[in-house]
Structures are given as C-alpha cells and as structure tokens.
Amino acid sequence: MASDFYLRYYVGHKGKFGHEFLEFEFRPDGKLRYANNSNYKNDVMIRKEAYVHKSVMEELKRIIDDSEITKEDDALWPPPDRVGRQELEIVIGDEHISFTTSKIGSLIDVNQSKDPEGLRVFYYLVQDLKCLVFSLIGLHFKIKPI
C-alpha cells in the first residue's frame, strides 16, 4: 500500500457519562482502526480493526484531494471547549496537516465562525469520512456503529 498516507480522526468530550469519543485511523498498510466509546446506559467501548483494499485507500486519498483540506488553516476555527473537540490528522505525500477545533453541531456553527469557508471544507470532509468508515465497519462486521 502507499506508505505516504495516514489519516486519523477523533471527536469526543468528557461529560456526565465520562470520556465519550469516536476515533478512527487509516494506516499506510491499509489497516483501519475504529473505536467508539459511549458510557450512556452502561454501553461498552466498541473497537474494530480491519484491513482495506488499496482501492479503498486510493478513494480515501481522492476524497481528501477533492476536498482541498490541505489548503486550509485552523487558526481562526473555534478552539476545543467544554462541548468537545475534534482532531483530524492527515499525511498525504509530503504534506502533514493537523487540525483541532470544537465539536460542530451544524452548519449554523460553521457559518457563525471566523472562517466559515475553511471550516465548511473541514465539516463536509469529516461527514464524508465518517460515512465511509461507518459503511466499511458496518459491512465488514455487520454492526451498527452509532
């Protein structure tokens, strides 16, 4: 697989039910790691690992390239707060980018930020990535990830 590619996404908060989070990563060798921790109603952490085909990795790269996220900067994005935090780290080719921001509830939050255009790119990319990961995990393990 492509050794010039890595992706990690995390969203979570510490609240009434402890540390609740969703995290996934794609490693250069095609390994997908997924973790979903919710203590609501005493749920247990879901951890799954699977290897994806190189065509999935290529599609992932295409999604990232098409989003143009590598042109963005999180300097004006809302910082993590009591509501939660999101982190996105991507290594693609010779670029290594990392973003940190607060949880985004809706496009209203995006539009009211100091950098609505950049945050919108992040918001839609994250939606696409989560959709892809939930589909891969759901199809591979026949579970409902959320």
UniProtKB/Swiss-Prot annotation:
Subcellular localization(s) per the UniProt record: Nucleus; Nucleus speckle; Cytoplasm
A GO MF label: RNA binding
UniProtKB keywords: Cytoplasm, mRNA processing, mRNA splicing, mRNA transport, Nucleus, RNA-binding, Transport
GO BP term (any one): mRNA processing
Nucleus among keywords: yes
Main location: nucleus
Quaternary context: Core component of the mRNA splicing-dependent exon junction complex (EJC); the core complex contains CASC3, EIF4A3, MAGOH, and RBM8A.
Known function: Required for pre-mRNA splicing as component of the spliceosome. Core component of the exon junction complex (EJC) and also involved in the nonsense-mediated decay (NMD) pathway. The EJC is a dynamic structure consisting of core proteins and several peripheral nuclear and cytoplasmic associated factors that join the complex only transiently either during EJC assembly or during subsequent mRNA metabolism.
Family indicated by similarity: Belongs to the mago nashi family.
Protein name: Protein mago nashi homolog
